[in-house]
Amino acid sequence: LFVCMAIGAQTVFKNEEVEVSLLKEKTWVFSTWDYTTMYLIEGEDKAVLIDTGTRCADLDKIVGQITGKPLEVIVTHMHPDHAGCIKYFDKVWMHRADTVLVPQHAADYQGEFLYMEEGQVFDLGGRKLEVAWMPGHTPGSVVLLDKANGDCYSGDAFGSGEVWLQCVPMSPIATFHESCCRMEKLMKEGHIKDIWCGHYPYLKSSLPLAYIQTMIRISHRLMNGDQEGSEPYSNYFIKMPPTARKLAEGRAMIVYDSTNIPEAR
């Protein structure tokens, strides 16, 4: 069932659905078959699993082979590619604002949802993760801040090259813009250096400050009704409405719904 090995220098586990690699000390990245990502963060006393992927059989057992520490499970948002395997865990942390998505994506979950608050700190022993609410992609999207090490684990809050803001229920573009501005401030103040995104296999690297600043520019245009240069957006796996569009600058792109854009000012 499981294959635990050292493949190359970094891989510590691999099967048909997931590959687990050491990202940095006591931090592992889980790259799944459909290019989604989980992160396992270990402290001296406890560990945290950030997101649970789409489909990864016996995820709890895989995690248990890597760390024997008591585990907290956090989902950055309630989309099925990040909360698809919560069934393997008795308790899962989420933001209350994403409960609107539970009937659609997690109605069969038999465990207990615990609700994170802005500024809540998970103390793992010698390592802390702070919750920051960053709505936009979903109403309850959060990121986890490891300020001591300069790391942010962002789920889909800022995308992985492209961010989806057309997902229902849609938030105003200004909401995403405000989240990006807050992230920029954290990075400029030196609290965060690297943003580790929710679809790491597409990039194989962290997102820098320049990426967030580009997202700020694009979202500022859209929230003021400027769609010049936008194009229709389609996705091979998920059917998009005819109103789905994309606006890109460099390596950053916002996917949005044209009905959610105000008239140009």
State where each predicted segment sits.
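Sec-dependent N-terminal signal peptides
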Residues: 1-5
